[in-house]
Amino acid sequence: MSLDHLSQQRFADLPLNAKVLEALESNGFEYCTPIQALSLPISLAGKDVAGQAQTGTGKTMAFLTATFHHLLEHPVKTNHPRALIMAPTRELAVQIAHDAERMVKTTGLKTALAYGGDGYDKQLKAIEAGADIIIGTTGRIIDYVKQNIIALSHIQVVVLDEADRMFDLGFIKDIRYLMRKCPSPKQRLTLLFSATLSYKVRELAFEDMNDPEYVEVEPLQKTGHRIKEELFYPSNEDKMPLLITLLEEEWPERCIIFANTKHQCEKIWGYLAADGHRVGLLTGDVAQKKRLSLLKQFTDGALDILVATDVAARGLHIPDVTHVFNYDLPDDREDYVHRIGRTGRAGESGVSISFACEEYAMNLPAIEEYIGHHIAVSQYDSDSLIRDLAKPYRLKPSLPASNRHNRNGAKPFKKRF
């Protein structure tokens, strides 16, 4: 683990509640990341924060630390939730809850998830048991509020994570509905984090926060200076052979392949599964229980490759992703940054390989204008690509055994055509 992404600010030197500090130190947190170093002195003092930082920079622990500290420092006897953390996706909500578990044992505060898809009875049981902190997506939280299962009248902390993504997904009305069910901004601590502090996000902060302080951690470049970016211009008929060939040569330990449509993702998955790769498929049509299982398998190393649509581009907090492939260049230039931000996290390096094919090459100029630099172009020899591809699977079989090997039976040398 690289440490040069950390600041000189020690958690022990901040005015933290002793139980929160114990939880941090027992989990190996000694120094703050830049966003933590900037935001925590403000939020620990009880002041609202609107923070901008890239994904993978420690935003989650920044607001969790502040939330647990605030609740412990301002105890209230109630069976109602005292903190509300809103996220744009189920996966991000689950990840936040997972990270919060690091503090639950030491602090004694209880969390509960609230997201759509499945798990209704389990979620309801946790909420009715007296959760201090509700973590979830806006739609399911509103359902519980309207059914009088959750009361927001005792909320002391409101957190909005990935605020820009909330706007993109059309959740702004839900956010405002929930915020106005909570005590007024002056009676609560409100923390907002976003990859961009756009006009819309700042407007929300102005209307629903109490004179927030803005903190920004500007990256050296939008795509992260530890990510090596590479671009190929394949013909449509070369795309799949090129992907298979690059996987043979790069031999990524853990990679995510993004495509623009569910159909394309299924096609990629079929070819890779037939080729013996341990690969999972993550699209919007995959059932929630299966999605969580796939993410766990990928995180635990049971899967080496995840093929995903942009539904999974935001909110995936998976360590040690070495490679990201853009099989299709995204139509939205910001999605390029969100996609490749899955690698090169927490001070580690990463590789991003993109295909500018006949269908999506038109998206490249807008992407390069947005990230502020040209992506290095690599050439390939079409005659050297692997073309004897196995017939792709069409139905998802059980997880294949680990027979991931190259065509000579061993890990190949690093060789580029």
Curated annotation (Swiss-Prot):
Alphabetical UniProt keywords: ATP-binding, Cytoplasm, Helicase, Hydrolase, Nucleotide-binding, RNA-binding
Reactions catalysed: ATP + H2O = ADP + phosphate + H(+)
Region feature Disordered, mapped onto this chain: 397-417
GO molecular function: ATP binding; ATP hydrolysis activity; RNA binding; RNA helicase activity
Species name: Mannheimia succiniciproducens (strain KCTC 0769BP / MBEL55E)
Any one cellular-component term (Gene Ontology): cytosol
Subcellular location(s) per record: Cytoplasm
Protein name: ATP-dependent RNA helicase RhlB
Feature: compositional bias, Basic residues: 404-417
Chain location of the short sequence motif Q motif per the record: 9-37
Record-annotated Helicase ATP-binding domain positions: 40-215
Motif mapping: DEAD box: 161-164
Keyword Ubl conjugation tagged: no
Description of how the protein assembles with itself and partners: Component of the RNA degradosome, which is a multiprotein complex involved in RNA processing and mRNA degradation.
Binding site for ATP: 53-60
Summary of the function given for this chain in its UniProt record: DEAD-box RNA helicase involved in RNA degradation. Has RNA-dependent ATPase activity and unwinds double-stranded RNA.
Record-listed E.C. numbers: 3.6.4.13
Domain of life, per lineage: Bacteria
Domain Helicase C-terminal: from-to ranges: 239-386
Enzyme class, UniProt record, top EC level: hydrolase
UniProt gene name: rhlB
PANTHER family found in the cross-reference section: ATP-DEPENDENT RNA HELICASE RHLB, ATP-DEPENDENT RNA HELICASE RHLE-RELATED
GO biological process: RNA catabolic process
HAMAP family to which the protein is assigned, alphabetical: DEAD_helicase_RhlB
Family that this chain belongs to: Belongs to the DEAD box helicase family. RhlB subfamily.
